[in-house]
């Protein structure tokens, strides 16, 4: 059995979801017999690094980030960041979402430390996090995406009217979102010029780049991809896609994570041909971005043709997240999924 450091929390807007992911990962790895060291990255950029491998996680308050951090620090003590430099771990299991956890930053840090980790590497993580760059790669590889524009904050401030006029060519409604972000945080459905101005100004308060994308009507689905090492070869498999029926206008943060916010159906209620096509494209997206270990790609099917919305390199891993749902539908246990992720991470570090 391995000594595994589980990283979760972080300073992104997805901190609370990452805590739930981290708790699920720790609990599962512990039942598998691994030695687990939970490492909490706090919302203000601090680290709580236990001095030893032991499980004393306050699962009972995992739905309350502030209480969780307080109780976690009581149990493990307040640590100094430099403790991470002497981390004794066979591998790091990443349960971070968004921000520096998903944009290649933590991956690069772990590579400097010489610690193998689960999931995609630095470059794939950075590209997938940048929605514009990812869309450009998808287009170059022959995949379909909705028409889009990227707007830089400086460009907007210098030529506001020209920028608004350009974005209006996408038509209404359209989706406005930070170029780097996840879990549909700060994503807005825009229906008119005034709202466009208002939400651009709002996003630019905390982000430097915005992407606006045409609104497509169709069936929303999401498809996970797992990598496995079998018979001396690396293999990629696509899981059964999940159909997303949002409780609101679209699959935003509330729909994703609030109870009753959306209805998720696995496998999706689509034709066998559409399912096969979605799975093929999910693997193609995974390969195009250079992902490793696992990923999850979101699509909207328009008149039978899937269009990529985005690829997530560290998809949610709570007990009710899409990857666990899809693995269950495929007859794959989460213990098996985690074993594969660990094996892929360890083998990748050898090359």
UniProtKB/Swiss-Prot annotation:
Cofactor note: Binds 2 magnesium or manganese ions per subunit.
Residues noted as binding ATP in the record, renumbered to the chain: 167-222
Domain ATP-grasp stretches: 135-343
Main location as per UniProt: cytoplasm
GO MF, one annotated term: D-alanine-D-alanine ligase activity
Cofactor: Mg(2+); Mn(2+)
Keywords: ATP-binding, Cell shape, Cell wall biogenesis/degradation, Cytoplasm, Ligase, Magnesium, Manganese, Metal-binding, Nucleotide-binding, Peptidoglycan synthesis
InterPro entries named in the record: ATP-grasp, ATP_grasp_subdomain_1, D-Ala_lig_Van_CS, D_ala_D_ala, Dala_Dala_lig_C, Dala_Dala_lig_N, PreATP-grasp_dom_sf
Residues that hold Mg(2+) 2 according to the record: 310, 312
This protein's pathway: Cell wall biogenesis; peptidoglycan biosynthesis
Endpoints of the signal sequence: none
One Gene Ontology cellular component annotation held by this UniProt entry: cytoplasm
Pfam families: Dala_Dala_lig_C (PF07478), Dala_Dala_lig_N (PF01820)
Catalysed reaction equations from the record: 2 D-alanine + ATP = D-alanyl-D-alanine + ADP + phosphate + H(+)
GO biological process, one term: cell wall organization
Chain residues that bind Mg(2+) 1: 298, 310
Top-level taxon of origin: Bacteria
Localization (cell): Cytoplasm
EC number: 6.3.2.4
Record family assignment: Belongs to the D-alanine--D-alanine ligase family.
Function description: Cell wall formation.
UniProt-recorded name of the protein: D-alanine--D-alanine ligase
The organism of origin for this protein: Leptospira interrogans serogroup Icterohaemorrhagiae serovar copenhageni (strain Fiocruz L1-130)
Upper taxonomic lineage: Bacteria, Pseudomonadati, Spirochaetota, Spirochaetia, Leptospirales
């Amino acid at each position: 059995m391995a000594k595994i450091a589980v990283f979760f929390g972080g300073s992104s807007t997805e901190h609370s979801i990452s805590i739930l992911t981290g708790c699920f990962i720790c609990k599962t790895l512990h039942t598998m017999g691994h030695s687990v060291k939970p490492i909490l990255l706090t919302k203000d950029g601090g680290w709580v690094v236990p001095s030893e491998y032991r499980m004393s996680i306050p699962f009972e308050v995992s739905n309350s980030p502030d209480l969780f951090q307080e109780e976690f620090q009581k149990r493990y003590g307040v640590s100094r960041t430099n403790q991470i430099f002497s981390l004794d771990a066979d591998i790091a299991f990443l349960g971070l979402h968004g921000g520096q956890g998903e944009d290649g930053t933590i991956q690069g840090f772990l590579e400097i430390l010489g610690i193998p980790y689960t999931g995609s590497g630095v470059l794939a993580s950075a590209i997938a996090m940048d929605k514009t760059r990812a869309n450009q790669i998808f287009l170059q590889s022959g995949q379909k995406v909705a028409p889009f524009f990227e707007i830089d904050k400086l460009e907007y401030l210098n030529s506001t009217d020209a920028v608004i006029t350009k974005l209006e060519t996408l038509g209404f409604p359209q989706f406005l979102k930070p170029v780097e972000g996840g879990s549909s945080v700060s994503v807005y459905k825009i229906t008119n010029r005034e709202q466009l101005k208002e939400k651009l100004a709002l996003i630019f308060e905390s982000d430097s780049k915005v992407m606006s994308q045409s609104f497509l009507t169709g069936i929303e689905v999401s498809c996970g991809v797992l990598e496995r090492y079998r018979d001396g070869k690396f293999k990629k498999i696509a899981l059964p896609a999940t159909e997303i029926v949002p409780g609101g206008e679209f699959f935003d943060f509330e729909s994703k994570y609030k109870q009753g916010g959306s209805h998720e159906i696995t496998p999706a209620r689509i034709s066998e041909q559409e399912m096969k096509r979605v799975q093929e494209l999910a693997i193609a997206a995974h390969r195009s971005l250079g992902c490793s270990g696992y990923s999850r790609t979101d699509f909207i099917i328009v008149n039978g043709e899937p269009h990529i919305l985005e690829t997530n390199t560290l998809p949610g891993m709570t007990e009710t997240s899409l990857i666990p749902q899809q693995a269950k539908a495929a007859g794959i246990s989460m213990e098996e999924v985690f074993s594969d992720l660990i094996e892929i991470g360890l083998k990748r570090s050898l090359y």
